[in-house]
Structure formats: C-alpha cells, structure tokens
C-alpha cells in the first residue's frame, strides 16, 4: 500500500492538483491576514495621530517668527466640476442649512482652514437661476390644482413671500410619502377670519417691500435680466397679479402648515424630478469662466445677493492672508491663490503658518485621519465590517417559532412573546444568481472547495488508472500462463469496471476543472482588478495626505522653547509619551504586515493562476484561450510591482522614529527618577529639621537659644556659645542633608533642561524623516500600481 500511495502521489496531475490546493489555501490564509493587517494599519494611523496630539499638548514648544511659512498644494477639483473649456459653478441647494447651501471644500492641510472656493461669474451673463422651491408630494406639481406656482414665477421664486414659503413640512416618513399617515396626524383647530385678513395684509406689505429691494438690487447687480424700465415694470406687474391670483389657492393648500407657524418647508420631491431639475440647472448655469479666489467659512443666505455683490479680483493674484482658526488657534495664517488659464483651475496654493507644536501636530493628525478614511473602500473589498457579515446571511431564510403559531420570515418583534426557537434554512436559489454581488472572500472559499474536490477526483482517477494497469498486466500474465477461462473472465470484468470508473472520474475532473476556470475568469479576475484599483486609489490619496504632512512638518525645524524656566514632565505627559511609543510601534508592525501579506496573497494567487493555465486533462488543452493569459500577465505585473517596492526604507523610517520616542521616554524616566530622589531627600531634610526643632524645644524652650549658653553660665552673666552643645551632631547631619538636597535640586533642574533639549532635537531630526519616507514610498507604490492597473485594461 505504501508503494502504491507513493506512486500515486508522484503522478504529475496529482502533484499539480495538490500544489493548487495548497496555494489556494495559502491565498485564503493570506487574504484573511491581509484584511486584518489593512484594518490594523488604518486604525494605527488614527491612533498615531491621536497619540501625537496628546504628546504635543504637553510640550511648550513654539514656532519662531523667523520660520518660513509652508506652501500647500490643494488637490484639483473633481472631474465632475470641470470641463475642457468651461467651469460649471456649484449648484445651490434650497436647504437653509449653511453647510448644504454652499458647502466649502476642505483642504487636506489643517483642520479648520477651508480651501478657497472658486466660482464662475460673468459680467455679461445672467445670474445662475436659483432652484425652484420644492413642495411636498401632496402639494407638488403632479396635481394640476395643487401647484401654487406657474411659469411666470421662475424669475425669482423667493421674491414674494407666500404661504407655502413660510410653511414647513417636517421630513418624517408620513409626510414624505405620497399618502400621509392620517392616523398619526392631529390637525389643530382652524383659524378664524382675522387670521386670513392679517396674512393678506402682510403679503401685500411684503410684496411692496420686495419690489423696492429688488429694484435696488437689480441696479447694483452685474446680472441684469432686462435692460429697460418698461420690461421690469411688466414683469413686476405680472408677478403682482400672480400673487393675488394664488392667494386663495395657497390658503387652502398649505393651510395646515400655516396653522403651525412654520418658517420653511422640506423637500420631498422624487429623485427623478430632482435629477431633471439639476440637469436643467446645469444647462442654464454654464457661462464664461471668471475665476475668483476667496477664503473663509462663509454662510450664504437664501438670496444670492451677497455672493454677486463682491467683484472678481484680477487673475494670477494671490489673495491676502486672512486669519483662520485651527483648534482655537486664531493666528494660524493661511493665504490662498489661484490663476485662470483657458478657463481651468490650473493651480491652487495655500500658505500655512502655525504657532506651536500643538497646531502642527493637529494638522498632521487631521491628515492621518483622512489617510485612514481613504482605506475604507479597500476594507469593504476585503470584507471588513458588519455589513459584509450580514450579506453572508442573506441567503438564509429565517423561521421564528412561537407558542401559538408558526410565523415564516417574520421578525420576533412582531409579537410580545419571545420565540421558542429560531431556525435557519439555506435558500439554494439565491446562492449563485448571475446578478448577485460576490465578494473576494467567498470566491476564494469556493475556489478552495473546488480545488479540494478536484484533488480528490484526480487522486481517485489516477488510482483507478494505476489499478487498471495492474489488471492489464495480470490479464496478460494469465493469458501467457494459459489459466482457465473463469479467472480470465473475472479479470476482464475488473478491467471493464475500472474503465467505467476512469471514464466517470475523468468526466468529474473535467466538470470540476471547468467550474474552477469559469469561477476564476468571471469572479476572481474582476475582483482582483477591482482590488488593485482600490489599492492604487488608496495609496494615491495617502500620498496626497503624506505630502501635505511632509510640508507641514517642516515647521518643526523652527521650534523653540519660549518658556524661560524648564517645566518638569508631568505623569500625564510621560504616559502620553509611552502611548506614543506604543502607537508608533503598532503602526510599524501593521505597515510591515500590510506589505507582507499583500505580497503573500499575490504570490499565492499568481502561482495558483500559473498552474491553472496547464490543463488537468489532455482533452482540455485546446480549450485554453487568450483571456487567462492576459489575466495572468496582470497578476505577474502585480507580483513584480510588489517585489520592487522599497518598503524597507519606509519601515526603517518608522522604526527610527520609535527609537526617537523611546529616547525621549527614557530621558523622561531619568528625570522622574531624579525627581523622586529629590523629593526623598527633601522629605528626609524636613524630617531631620523637625527632629532638631523638637530637641531645641526640649533643651532650650526657644528657637533663638540654639548654640547659646544658658543664663548665668559665664562671667558677668554674659551669654556665650556652648562648646558642649548636645545638638551639634544633629545640626551637622542637617547641614549635610541640606547640601545633598541642593545638589539633587541642581541635578533635577539639569535633567529637566536635558529632557526639553532632547525632545526638541529629536522631534526636529526624527519627525520630518518619517513623512519624507512615507511620501516617497506612497508615490512609488502609487506609480507601480498605476502600471498594474494599466495592464488590467487589456483583460477582455
């Protein structure tokens, strides 16, 4: 048996399938650890930023006035906001919230500094039309009699205050739906006639005021819709008539919201209508580009007059430096600038200057958080999070068994009684649907199951072949010896049975091999391409944030200690230093694990892919085509890119920063030891001084008689020193202890100075090197993955 098993294992097909099974098992293992390492790396970035911020809070280091400011290159606008020759201004949302009315684009540099907002204006074009207010579905334009607006009101929807403009529909599911839940709706008592009279007077008064305001605003605005006074008068008259015609309709339609004295309404229009309206706004808002650079977090009112009153500055001129706060730092100066070239935003820079180490580290922490957030998409691809676990159970049908009845596919919360049992059964129809979303984890698990099955089938087929060869040799020997026909028939029957088993197992091998190839080409390859693009975009974003950190951290070279007397290191600050060392160590280990397991995963997949290109059966040799060759070239390019990545440089840079923090922590520990010795010596001095004072009270009954002779102890009753003072030894010991305390105090002061100087020097020399290495590594990794992604485009 041992020889037969050894011969079976030495068969090429069995050995190859065994290697395929092993490689797929290694790929599953590496993917699992890659997902964990990726999650640890993103988490370590956040923890390192927080630890740096806590450490910087205890360091009184300021940036000198001679330190030059740093220039930060802001990322380009999204492609959706650019065109080859025109720049579409941002659309204004009808929501009154400042963040949604005009959302500022944040810069990856500092926490609260805002990226200069660049808008398109033109002196000879019409103002961008503000979107129409959207009514709830029950009052929307879908009903001919329910719309309080007409085509004539498109000039300025907010020009005249009306009932529906002053009303608010809360964005609840009952109000947002097309059919209201009237059981939960309790309308108030209807208003009297005085209410409507008062509202009509207010409408008339506000309409007159709006006419005057609009006239003044139109004169000073650079977007005039009409050039003649006659056209303006006609439009105003038509709007006045419209308001008068719609008064009664508005009273009836938005009566419930007027009773509740709401100020605005919520948008409950359908998504299709919103998309059509936004497309109309996009087509109407395209204009000649005039670039304007401004800075600061501004709040837009419902009308757009404040925005249009400001003139556009000349292009290619940097805006003046303004004050921006960053974590309560009021004088962190940020200047911004942009220039116009053919209508496109060609470059934007920000000049940043921070006051102290805390502000610098907070800006670095913000970019750490952004870099960690850029890996969330890859985390989803690698199946991290609760949503991926819930997706795995989507094919299970839940049956909740209660004491009274059997409720299928119902939640246990539908009844007050707890369920007696919850049973799951698999839904086989939902397992392999063509349009169902499949994950990389499930694909690898299925491939591993198929590879195990293929190995067993190949092993069985080759075993039958070996047994078939033995039976043939036995038959030949029996025929040569001339044995009886019964034995020959028995041997022939065994040979026939083995031939049937070989045919069946060969068909099973072919079916399994085809299933593996199909799963490889339809699921695994697209998922690998998606994962590669995900890593590429992740490292591209990380490169931007690390580059920003590298620019910001240059300011630590200008740090100085403005405090005249060195402050001792508190216990809280020593703990923050230890936490920083632990965080950077975790960062280093997770970075090494991330690169290692990504290499292991791609190496395993690459080697397995190479073996799958070889046909298991000779009959399948003609079925191989070019598609897997292109996919294999993609995997091979990815493997070579990972092998060429100089991750050791970045890893050593992070490791060197661990040593830097460790040296700071060691100096703080030495300072703490000297402080303990000083405190111990001070306590001993106080104890001995107290003992001497007690003895003085006992022998002399006074503090002023120390070392002085008793009365009438000398000639002429004069006081004189007592040479036989019993406290002289105690006083000598007290003097020695006092000198030792003074020496310890001097050592403690020097230890504080050494700690402060060592901290400043290590931060200035160690911290910039980390971000320089990370910036270079992320740039090289991004470029390598871009080459791999380019190779993926050739996959059919």
Curated annotation (Swiss-Prot):
Keyword Ribonucleoprotein set for record: no
Matches recorded under InterPro entries: DUF630, DUF632
Annotated Acidic residues bias: 273-283
Compositional bias per record (Basic residues), positions renumbered to this chain: 124-135
Coiled-coil portions: 227-255
Phenotype caused by lack of the gene: Under high nitrate concentration, seedlings are slightly smaller and display later flowering than wild-type. Under low nitrate concentration, seedlings appear normal. Nitrate accumulation of the seedlings and roots is significantly lower than in wild-type, however no difference of nitrate accumulation in leaves. Nitrate content differences in roots and leaves may be due to the reduced expression of NPF6.3/NRT1.1 in roots and the increased expression of NPF7.2/NRT1.8 in leaves.
Protein name per its UniProtKB record: Nitrate regulatory gene2 protein
Origin superkingdom: Eukaryota
Origin species: Arabidopsis thaliana
Assigned GO CC terms: nucleus
UniProt keyword terms in alphabetical order: Coiled coil, Nucleus, Transcription, Transcription regulation
Chain spans, region Disordered: 57-174, 190-342
Record PANTHER family: BZIP DOMAIN CLASS TRANSCRIPTION FACTOR (DUF630 AND DUF632)-RELATED, PROTEIN ALTERED PHOSPHATE STARVATION RESPONSE 1
A Pfam family the protein falls into: DUF632
Subcellular location(s) of the protein: Nucleus
Keyword Transcription regulation listed: yes
One Gene Ontology biological process: nitrogen compound transport
Biased composition (Low complexity): 98-118
